[in-house]
């Protein structure tokens, strides 16, 4: 038995190399070589080895190309910061929280400024109409001292309750086994002087259940993080916190009408806003002041149960306009012959504002073109405090 027959893979490998390097041979190769290559190429073993060699060469080139791309591509990108996960997604990144020092307040402003908790709105008594706006707090993670025995320390504004519940959760995370202690909330016995937000249910004095005064500086910091509008490390015995009024939060963000206000339908019928439905066509106004009928496609802010403060504007003709303080009203300036927009609570006497003429047809059959629903409206409200001048904002 010869060598070629005893080692078949050696013969196949040599022929494969010959086939791959065929272009390097001269055209004057012998017929015996051609016949040998032809005969071996017909063999299945030869075809398999040729395919393997070609595949290995392709894989080698592909590996080199991928390695080159992995080196070059990172150089073509610039670093960028992305938004983090929202609330409830993933774990919160640990932050270094620094405790407040004695007599420190955040923000470092008067409590009654608009940038803090805002001005006083009046004492709330049990027989006051606003008393029903106070809500009890039955959070089991909060201890209420309730020295009076009347449950008054559990009563507070909705915003104060919301922030207090957040703070209670933070206290349990910061000091396991320790709970938040509320020593004073709504006060009906006038123990806090003539001017105090305790009388409106917008302020609380707090401590920890173990009465450890070394924790109070960090407790004040946790109150700031919980969202209280004004926090003061007022005493070694407790922390004082207060919030904006519920009415100022809602009425200064959106402009609304009362549910009893009416809208003129295309059919000529006047319908209360509280009874409007999606699809009703109501009289509105275009940018150039022309009256048109527009279809109701969405209610951006509709709450028929919410109690709200409103402003009433009376004209010499007997018309009455009832809107929230932050509602924009079309005001006519005779001197400059210009139409501007002013917040309702900033309109003064002898001001001309735009009303519909009862004799006009309101635009006939003309229909307004819908431009779609602006889903980003709430985002614009949130960034307005950072991008708009102070004179443009309703604070």
Swiss-Prot record:
CDD domains: Hint
EC identifiers of the protein: 3.1.-.-
GO CC terms in record: endocytic vesicle; endosome; extracellular space; nucleus; plasma membrane
Gene3D superfamilies per record: 3.30.1380.10, Hedgehog/Intein (Hint) domain (2.170.16.10)
Propeptide, chain numbering: 27-82
Keywords: Autocatalytic cleavage, Calcium, Cell membrane, Cytoplasm, Developmental protein, Hydrolase, Lipoprotein, Membrane, Metal-binding, Morphogen, Nucleus, Palmitate, Protease, Segmentation polarity protein, Signal, Transferase
InterPro entries associated with the record: Hedgehog, Hedgehog_Hint, Hedgehog_sig/DD-Pept_Zn-bd_sf, Hedgehog_Signaling, Hedgehog_signalling_dom, Hint_dom_N, Hint_dom_sf, Intein_N
Signal peptide: 1-26
Site (Involved in cholesterol transfer): 301
Location within or outside the cell: Nucleus; Cytoplasm
Biological process per Gene Ontology, one example term: genital disc anterior/posterior pattern formation
UniProt record similarity statement: Belongs to the hedgehog family.
Subunit architecture: Interacts with shf.
Protein name (Swiss-Prot/TrEMBL): Protein hedgehog
Biological source species: Drosophila simulans
Lineage of origin: Eukaryota, Metazoa, Ecdysozoa, Arthropoda, Hexapoda
Gene that this sequence comes from: hh
């Amino acid at each position: 038995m010869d060598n070629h027959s005893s080692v078949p893979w050696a013969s196949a490998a040599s022929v494969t190399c010959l086939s791959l390097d065929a272009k390097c041979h001269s055209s004057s190769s012998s017929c015996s070589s051609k016949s040998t290559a032809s005969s071996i190429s017909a063999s299945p073993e030869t075809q398999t080895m040729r395919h393997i060699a070609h595949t290995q060469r392709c894989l080698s080139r592909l590996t080199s190309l991928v390695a080159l791309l992995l080196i070059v591509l990172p150089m073509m990108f610039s670093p960028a910061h992305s938004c983090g996960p929202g609330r409830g997604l993933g774990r919160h990144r640990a932050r270094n929280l620094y405790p407040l020092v004695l007599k420190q307040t955040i923000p470092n402003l008067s409590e009654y400024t608009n940038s803090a908790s805002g001005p006083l709105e009046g004492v709330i008594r049990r027989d006051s109409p606003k008393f029903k706006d106070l809500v009890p707090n039955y959070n089991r993670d909060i201890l209420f001292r309730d020295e009076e025995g009347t449950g008054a320390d559990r009563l507070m504004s909705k915003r104060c309750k919301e922030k207090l519940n957040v703070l209670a959760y933070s206290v349990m995370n910061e000091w396991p086994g320790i709970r938040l202690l509320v020593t004073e909330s709504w006060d009906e016995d006038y123990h806090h002087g003539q001017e105090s937000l305790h009388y409106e249910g917008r302020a609380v004095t707090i401590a920890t259940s173990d009465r450890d005064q070394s924790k109070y500086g960090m407790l004040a910091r946790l109150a700031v993080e919980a969202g209280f509008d004004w926090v003061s490390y007022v005493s070694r015995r407790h922390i004082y916190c207060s919030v904006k009024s519920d009415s100022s939060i809602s009425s200064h963000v959106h402009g609304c009408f009362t549910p009893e206000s009416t809208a003129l339908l295309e059919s000529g019928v006047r319908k209360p806003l509280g009874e409007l439905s999606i699809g009703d066509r109501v009289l509105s106004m275009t940018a150039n002041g022309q009256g048109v009928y527009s279809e109701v496609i969405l209610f951006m802010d509709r709450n028929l149960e919410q109690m709200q403060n409103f402003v009433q504007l009376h004209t010499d003709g007997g018309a009455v306009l009832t809107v929230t303080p932050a509602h924009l009203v079309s005001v006519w300036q005779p001197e400059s012959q210009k139409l501007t927009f002013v917040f309702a609570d900033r309109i003064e006497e002898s001001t001309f504002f735009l009303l519909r003429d009862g004799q006009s047809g309101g635009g006939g059959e003309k229909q307004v073109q819908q431009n779609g629903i602006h889903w980003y409206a709430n985002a614009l409200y949130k960034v307005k405090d950072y991008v708009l001048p102070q004179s443009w904002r309703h604070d």
